[in-house]
């Protein structure tokens, strides 16, 4: 299988999100990279499902709560930016303050 660098990046985000989701299901509080992976994956999948950029941004803010991550993580994650492929092309989606206190 020959993947482009962009496809490899998407695959790594997916894999990291799967690991993070399994840990979250076990009740483990997520660290910074795990939180970023879950939020990024949710945005990428929203775009793939045909959602608008605004909808994808909103979905990114609903993925995690402060109770699901380590104490310092919400303050560390003030912005998540991810390139996602929408029906009308690839766009940079910015999710501000994605982890609500």
UniProtKB/Swiss-Prot annotation:
Its main location: cytoplasm. Transmembrane segments: none annotated. Signal peptide: none annotated. One of its GO terms (cellular component) is cytoplasm. One of its GO terms (biological process) is urea catabolic process. Its EC number is 3.5.1.5. It is an enzyme of class 3 (hydrolase). Coiled coil: none annotated. Keywords: Cytoplasm, Hydrolase. Pathway: Nitrogen metabolism; urea degradation; CO(2) and NH(3) from urea (urease route): step 1/1. Pfam families: Urease_gamma (PF00547). InterPro entries: Urease_gamma, Urease_gamma/gamma-beta_su, Urease_gamma_sf, Urease_subunit. One of its GO terms (molecular function) is urease activity. It is found in: Cytoplasm. It catalyses: urea + 2 H2O + H(+) = hydrogencarbonate + 2 NH4(+). The keyword Cytoplasm applies. HAMAP family: Urease_gamma (MF_00739). Heterotrimer of UreA (gamma), UreB (beta) and UreC (alpha) subunits. Three heterotrimers associate to form the active enzyme. Belongs to the urease gamma subunit family. This is Urease subunit gamma. It comes from Corynebacterium kroppenstedtii (strain DSM 44385 / JCM 11950 / CIP 105744 / CCUG 35717). The gene is ureA.
């Amino acid at each position: 299988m020959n993947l482009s660098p962009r496809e490899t990046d998407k695959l790594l985000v997916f894999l990291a999100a799967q690991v993070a989701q399994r840990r979250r299901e076990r009740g483990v509080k997520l660290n910074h990279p795990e939180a970023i992976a879950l939020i990024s994956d949710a945005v990428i999948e929203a775009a793939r499902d045909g959602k608008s950029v605004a909808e994808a941004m909103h979905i990114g803010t609903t993925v995690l709560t402060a109770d699901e991550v380590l104490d310092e993580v919400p303050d560390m994650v003030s912005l998540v930016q991810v390139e996602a492929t929408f029906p009308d092309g690839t766009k940079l989606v910015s999710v501000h303050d994605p982890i609500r206190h």
